[in-house]
Amino acid sequence: MTKYKYSVKNLKENQAKALARDASVSFKSAIEACNFLRGRTTKQALSLLEKVLDKKIAIPFKRFTDGVGHRRGNGIAAGRYPQKLSDVLIKLIKNAEANASIKALNENLKIVHLSAQKASVPMHYGRHPRREMKRSHIELIVEEIEEKKKEPKKKKSDVKSTTTTKTKTKSENQKKRESYS
């Protein structure tokens, strides 16, 4: 049996990770969901996945679209509502949040790395040798979002204007127009 390792080698101190090995979910839908959630905060991702479970928001399928029907939504051509995958991803995100709290990180977490790899396909016993059991590994790395400190705004008197504007009166503009004609 081969040993599984994270694809990200060097983990920063403000990052936490979680892994779902041999999850019984489709590899193709896992890739699409990872692309949909990457770059979002964990709170946003959890709320989106809850809406997917309620079938209010579809996960857009952009790469594996063969036979996938059109879904209603902004910018979604094809999409699905993967229920098992949503459950696995919710558990994985909560696991990463727990790992982050153990490392004493605050609750503002952003999903930096979320990827799916194809797992081994076990032999399916029985009379149907063509039936495959779909499994995949899903890894997640979250990073703490540092709050930006607000600087006090500078007053207009402190800022020096580099350009000078010249305003013309109506009479100057009229004289100029008359000289052209």
Predicted regions and their residues:
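Low-complexity, rRNA-contacting terminal tracts
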Residues: 1-25, 98, 102-181
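Ribosome large-subunit tunnel/peptidyl-transferase-proximal elements
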Residues: 2-108, 141-144
